Amino acid sequence: MQSLKLFVLFGWISIFACAQKPAAGISKVEWMTLEQASESMQKEKRPILIDLYTDWCGWCKVMDKKTYSNKKVSAYLQEKFYSVKLNAEGTNSISWNGKTYKFNPNYKTHDFAIYLTGGQLSYPTTVIIPVEESQPQAIPGYLEPKDFEMIVKYFGEGKFGIMPFNQFQQQFKSSW
């Protein structure tokens, strides 16, 4: 009986000792719907960043955990973008710029995801719709915070359409 008590006590101590506190500096992006982003654009012009994901995508989960949970990333997105999380396999209709997009059973994906990526589906994909509502700019693949920084700052600082990306890339100094 004594050894059972010690075993239980040791188990509880182990559980509390191994329990992790949230990592310091971790924050989350405050995601909104596409409709909310569109309404917000009427009040204040900002680019829209869309995280295009699927439920089964492992790299999408890694990007959520490592990139979008990064304090500097989330703070910058909160300040400069309207951030939208969009399931590419979602079945709800989406209205955008006077057009309605629906789930496409032939491709087993949403027509809006096909539109955003120009038909080049890959997950995760970060899509940025610049302020002037030009074509969506799709950046496929997992992006670590240091790689993500240059891309979002190119759009967030208003350089898209003014300066070629390769010129911005040469002048860019990372601060994350």
Model segments located where?
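A short beta-strand-turn-helix
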Residues: 29-48, 77
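Non-globular targeting/processing and membrane-anchoring segments
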Residues: 18-29, 42, 130, 136-176
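Short active-site neighborhood of thiol/selenol oxidoreductases, capturing the structured segment around
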Residues: 44-58, 83
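Thioredoxin-like thiol-disulfide oxidoreductase module
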Residues: 71-74, 78-140, 145, 150-157
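Detector for the c-type heme attachment site
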Residues: 61-65
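Ligand/cofactor pocket segment of small-molecule handling proteins
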Residues: 60, 70
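Bacterial Sec-dependent N-terminal signal peptides
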Residues: 1-24
